[in-house]
Amino acid sequence: MDRLRIPKHRAEVELTGPDGEARRFSLFLSEHTSHGGPERVVDLLNGPREFLPAVDCETDATTFLARSCIVIARVAGPLWDVDEVNLPLEHEVEVVLSNGKALSGLISYVLPHESCRVVDYLNDPAPFLALVEGERVALVNKRYVLRVTLR
């Protein structure tokens, strides 16, 4: 049976739910993906699965998280490797959530030249946007975003 299992590794994240409570979880990520490297937390959150298996870092309990109810997932940065061919565009922004909480940081993305405006990035169908907060990255669920303001 072990030969049928997909190899996974754990990634620690700090998740904030709609109630504002932040908790640490370990998510299970695949070692190989279609983009050629290991799966990242952003890949998992922007993927098709609604419930994500995780381990609560405080209680060591196995739990299944409803992806749509994750407001913010904070991970160690950076999100991806930067190379000389695909330098990201970066904009300093303030993201105000529907609960009134404001987050500040950089949105950093690589899009085709013909659709590389901030609004193009925000309207991408992926449910989470990435906000660089110094050494960490906040993956913010767009369902909970009230507005994004350029600074």
Regions found by a protein language model. Give the residues of each.
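Conserved RNA-binding domains used in RNP assembly and mRNA/RNA metabolism
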Residues: 1-151
